[in-house]
């Protein structure tokens, strides 16, 4: 339970530590063959680090690790916070609240079959210290008015003055599939309608990985530093379980 303090602190969309909202205009699609420039509602999730980028690859890993911990030791987790992350029990284990927070965001990052998104924002975020509710970085949509949302195109995307080494979609698709499949089992007793929704999406996400094997790396605009994931087989194996 102690580690969940950190997860609540990292929440995006609404942050219970600040008792304020942030990044509520996210975001605008990039790299999609027909939807680039359109708005997509991808509020929620967690900030990746001390910056405010958000990645499917790291968020899905965090979600799955929490789900696995709860699945193996459900009696180890208490209920001292509500779903918004405020003090006060709500009848749901706090770790399940946090799992649900993450899965809600992951669901937004997969709005339709074959439409998977890998990342919100990029290293243009690295523009000085500020709290998330004071983030006014301008990505071309106006200061603080929305950030880019990177579509899993399966093709190389920007990496500073270079391109990343993306070869497919499977590494990300497998993560969606595994999180949705296990998440549906864990949430069915608490959020049955949402559990059914993500359960239906699990196979579609997996099939997208089958169609587009390969690794889906993250993107950067100003520097060459990214998550250089090059393995995708393990993600698809977990998604198939």
How should each PLM-predicted stretch be described?
Residues 1-61, 97-164:
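Low-complexity, Ser/Thr/Pro/Gly-enriched N-terminal "stalk/linker" regions
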Residues 63-86, 104-112, 175-192, 235-241:
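Well-ordered alpha-helical scaffold segments within catalytic/enzyme domains
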Residues 57-68, 206:
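Conserved long hydrophobic alpha-helices within structured protein cores
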Residues 55, 92, 99, 195-198, ...:
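Hydrophobic packing residues in well-ordered alpha-helices of helical domains and bundles
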Residues 39-49, 117-230, 237-241:
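Active-site lining segments of carbohydrate-active enzymes
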Residues 52, 56, 68-78, 162, ...:
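Conserved, well-structured interaction surfaces
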Residues 84-95:
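Acidic, glycine-anchored loop motifs typical of Ca2+
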């Amino acid at each position: 339970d102690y580690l969940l303090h950190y997860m609540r602190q990292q929440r995006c969309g609404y942050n219970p530590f600040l008792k304020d909202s942030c990044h509520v205009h996210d975001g605008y699609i990039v790299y999609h063959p027909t939807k680039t420039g359109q708005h997509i509602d991808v509020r929620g999730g967690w900030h990746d680090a001390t910056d405010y980028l958000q990645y499917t690859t790291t968020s899905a890993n965090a979600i799955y690790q929490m789900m696995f911990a709860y699945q193996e030791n459900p009696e180890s987790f208490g209920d001292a916070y509500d779903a918004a992350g405020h003090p006060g029990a709500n009848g749901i284990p706090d770790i399940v609240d946090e799992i649900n927070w993450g899965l809600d965001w992951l669901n937004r990052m997969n709005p339709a079959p074959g439409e998977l998104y890998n990342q919100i924002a990029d290293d243009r975020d690295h523009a000085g210290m500020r709290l998330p509710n004071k983030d006014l970085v301008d990505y071309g949509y106006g200061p603080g008015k929305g950030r880019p949302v990177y579509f899993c195109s399966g093709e190389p995307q920007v990496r500073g003055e270079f391109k990343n080494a993306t070869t497919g979609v499977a590494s990300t698709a497998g993560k969606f599939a595994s999180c949705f499949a296990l998440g549906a089992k864990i949430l069915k007793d608490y959020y049955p309608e949402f559990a059914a929704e993500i359960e239906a999406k699990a196979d579609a996400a997996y099939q997208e990985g089958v169609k587009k094997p390969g690794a889906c790396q993250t993107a950067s605009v100003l520097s060459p530093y990214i998550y250089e994931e090059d393995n995708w087989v393990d993600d698809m194996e977990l998604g198939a379980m």
